[in-house]
Amino acid sequence: MALSQNQAKFSKGFVVMIWVLFIACAITSTEASLTKCQQLQASANSGLIGAYVPQCKETGEFEEKQCWGSTGYCWCVDEDGKEILGTKIRGSPDCSRRKAALTLCQMMQAIIVNVPGWCGPPSCKADGSFDEVQCCASNGECYCVDKKGKELEGTRQQGRPTCERHLSECEEARIKAHSNSLRVEMFVPECFEDGSYNPVQCWPSTGYCWCVDEGGVKVPGSDVRFKRPTC
């Protein structure tokens, strides 16, 4: 028995609806099988050229280190792919230490925001220390800093300056002690090769040794005589 015109239209529409539902279910099933990282990766790959594309492991989880190739920046992420504050640098951060305590540079990087007229967050090395050269994105000025991130006077200029290693506080104190014209034996601080204070300081003429902090300040109660304390 031949189908009426209305029946034929209904039958055709029903078939189309079934196909639409089938395709929708297939797409939903495919998306459901993808991890969050893979979904974001697929979405980014279909977007603008040069956009950030998440890097995923073979298992679908986020790689601990994420990089944005067009900018040269890399950073560490948690299991949900969220950036761990203070880890973004130009180059390759050490994300095996991502749960370790942040360095001063990383903490400043995490809390300082880009404000017009300000230099913005500092640039940190892979080990978390300050880059010798810091630059202001707002005006293109760059300058040299010490190990604590403090600007070295006379180094600010347009473009990147050549930042030779300057004398540290410990090295300056050591030179000053050696140049003293008095014959009395002065205390001469002990410095490491990188210019930082040796945590154990001694005054040979008195026989005393003591512990100091990173700034060379004596730790109260650490004085001992005729031996080196454990600092």
Swiss-Prot record:
This is Equistatin. The keyword Protein biosynthesis does not apply. Residues 1-32 form the signal peptide. Potent inhibitor of papain-like cysteine proteinases (Ki=0.18-0.57 nM on papain), as well as of the aspartic proteinase cathepsin D (Ki=0.3-05 nM). It holds the Pfam family Thyroglobulin_1. The keyword Acetylation does not apply. GO terms for cellular component: extracellular space. GO terms for molecular function: cysteine-type endopeptidase inhibitor activity. Keywords: Disulfide bond, Protease inhibitor, Repeat, Secreted, Signal, Thiol protease inhibitor. Residues 34-95, 102-163, 167-231 form the Thyroglobulin type-1 domain.
